[in-house]
Amino acid sequence: MKIAIVNDMPLAVEALRRAVALEPAHQVVWVASNGAEAVQRCTEQLPDLILMDLIMPVMDGVEATRRIMAETPCAIVIVTVDRKQNVHRVFEAMGHGALDVVDTPALGAGDAREAAAPLLRKILNIGWLVGQQRAPAARSVAAPLREASQRRGLVAIGSSAGGPAALEVLLKGLPAAFPAAIVLVQHVDQVFAAGMAEWLSSAAGLPVRLAREGEPPQPGQVLLAGTNHHIRLLQNGQLAYTAEPVNEIYRPSIDVFFESVARYWNGDAVGVLLTGMGRDGAQGLKLMRQQGFLTIAQDQASSAVYGMPKAAAAIDAAVEIRPLERIAGRLTEFFAK
């Protein structure tokens, strides 16, 4: 994989160089010391992956991510030395299309491979996502769409790259007294999950908190999957975290949650698949449609990364394909019936 480093700190650059060099399949193709330089370098030599710092002179990592994803899109991972202090910037960058976030590996650590392991795992996962070329599954006839009733309601939302900003827009568009439960599955490391819930609560104006083991989704609640395990709905209506299936690249998996909703939810439900790279959520959304639930995929024009919604559209998993700004209104209309 061809990797670029964008960082103004020489020690951080050297630490990242050494970490990347631990895997012979990876090579550093260029280094930029600020975001403006990175934007220019991407027009000259587009890498497979950029390791992007947040705090830099001239142009910071948030604006650089926005510019690169708009002009020469490629995979971006945010690399930071202070996650707590930079949590809001992290979600801004992810809102513009950054895929993930990881700590800067320590230079001179006793076991270099162990220190670099979190970064190398992220690179491996993103390499798999960028390179995957699965053929779309065969289409099947969906069950007739269920009309909303007076039964309890659930909105299951999956998102990845570009998700934080998309979730902010969607949640902002919902009324304060929205009657259904909402469960969010965003590809984010558990270290950042609590910060994301806090950020969404502040930015979107609806209280968002982490989903707890064993609790049922309740009307009016907005719950965010909060660990590196998958979240699923059990037959008794409670939420549970599980390590299985272990072979899922992203944790939490959107497919795992959507599939459990299709299998066990006995009220009204809507599945929503937002911006993101890869195919996670497409098959689960299709299962929800086959059970007669309303399913919605974000359209290409409003997606920061048109991967997951595109995969859903390709297998006819979405009953409706909508611009982001029109999804909240559709949910409100559906549950008002």
UniProtKB/Swiss-Prot annotation:
InterPro entries: CheB-like (IPR008248), CheB_C (IPR035909), CheY-like_superfamily (IPR011006), Sig_transdc_resp-reg_Me-estase (IPR000673), Sig_transdc_resp-reg_receiver (IPR001789). GO terms for cellular component: cytoplasm. Residues 2-119 form the Response regulatory domain. The modification 4-aspartylphosphate is found at residue 53. Its main location: cytoplasm. Keywords: Chemotaxis, Cytoplasm, Hydrolase, Phosphoprotein. Phosphorylated by CheA. Phosphorylation of the N-terminal regulatory domain activates the methylesterase activity. Its EC number is 3.1.1.61, 3.5.1.44. It catalyses: [protein]-L-glutamate 5-O-methyl ester + H2O = L-glutamyl-[protein] + methanol + H(+); L-glutaminyl-[protein] + H2O = L-glutamyl-[protein] + NH4(+). GO terms for biological process: chemotaxis. One of its GO terms (molecular function) is protein-glutamate methylesterase activity. Residues 144-337 form the CheB-type methylesterase domain. It is found in: Cytoplasm. The active site is at residues 160, 187, 280. Contains a C-terminal catalytic domain, and an N-terminal region which modulates catalytic activity. P.putida strain KT2440 does not have a chemotaxis group 2 operon. Belongs to the CheB family. Involved in chemotaxis. Part of a chemotaxis signal transduction system that modulates chemotaxis in response to various stimuli. Catalyzes the demethylation of specific methylglutamate residues introduced into the chemoreceptors (methyl-accepting chemotaxis proteins or MCP) by CheR. Also mediates the irreversible deamidation of specific glutamine residues to glutamic acid. HAMAP family: CheB_chemtxs. This is Protein-glutamate methylesterase/protein-glutamine glutaminase of group 3 operon. The lineage of its organism: Bacteria, Pseudomonadati, Pseudomonadota, Gammaproteobacteria, Pseudomonadales.
